[in-house]
A protein has these predicted regions:
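Helix-to-loop junctions at the C-terminal end of transmembrane segments
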Residues: 59-71, 159
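Transmembrane alpha-helix termini and helix-breaking/packing motifs in multi-pass membrane transporters
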Residues: 36, 68, 147-170
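Paired small-residue
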Residues: 15, 97-106
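Helix-loop boundary and gating motifs at the non-cytosolic
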Residues: 2-58
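Symmetry-related core transmembrane helices of the 12-TM Major Facilitator Superfamily/SLC fold
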Residues: 165-183
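C-terminal ends and interior cores of transmembrane alpha-helices
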Residues: 81-95, 99
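Cytoplasmic helix-loop-helix junction between adjacent transmembrane helices
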Residues: 102-144
């Protein structure tokens, strides 16, 4: 165990968990983006959510087997990578099926991404700080709430400047979180 690595994990965890809690810009403008940019109708948008959630539910056991096989650390990295790929597909996908695949990857990513909570718990136990779990989660939730609030405010202005600008922000945040995921190690 490297104490310096654990300290770095402790500092970065709230930022990683807070900024990767969702596709930040996507959450603020998803319906607007799908109707204005992708020209989807309401039934396509509703079916997009339904298909992705049903697929994710059906994949839960295979996904859990993959997590068990690759471990917590690689699961977090895979989740971050899938969020990045998802944001790219949702942004650049021109066909409905490509956007469906992007949305499925978005849902699946969170199954892997949620292993960050196990990593946090394990690392805090290693440091005899398990009673601070709520503090770390609260800090991450606060960062997520502030980021979401700010992004919700600016996303509409960005969308009015260029319809793709908020999604470029989304991809950028996903890339940063993917890079940060390499510091999210289950020691």
């Amino acid at each position: 165990m490297n104490e310096q690595n654990l300290k770095r994990f402790n500092k970065l965890f709230p930022w990683f968990a807070g900024l990767s809690g969702d596709l930040l810009f996507w959450a603020a403008i998803d319906t607007l983006f799908l109707t204005v940019v992708k020209n989807f109708n309401t039934s396509q948008i509703v079916s997009l959510t339904s298909i992705s959630l049903i697929t994710c539910i059906l994949l839960q056991i295979p996904l859990l087997n993959i997590i068990k096989k690759i471990g917590n650390t690689k699961s977090v990295r895979l989740g971050s990578l899938l969020l990045l790929i998802s944001s790219i597909l949702l942004t650049l996908g021109t066909d409905y099926i490509i956007v469906v695949i992007g949305k499925i990857l978005y849902e699946v990513a969170f199954t892997f991404q949620n292993m960050i909570n196990v990593v946090l718990k394990n690392n805090l136990e290693l440091q005899n700080r398990e009673n601070e779990y709520i503090k770390f989660r609260t800090n991450a939730n606060t960062i997520y709430a502030i980021a979401t609030m700010i992004i919700s405010f600016v996303a509409s202005f960005m969308f009015n400047i260029n319809n793709y600008l908020p999604m470029i922000g989304c991809i950028t945040f996903c890339f940063v979180c993917f890079v940060l995921s390499f510091n999210m190690i289950d020691y």
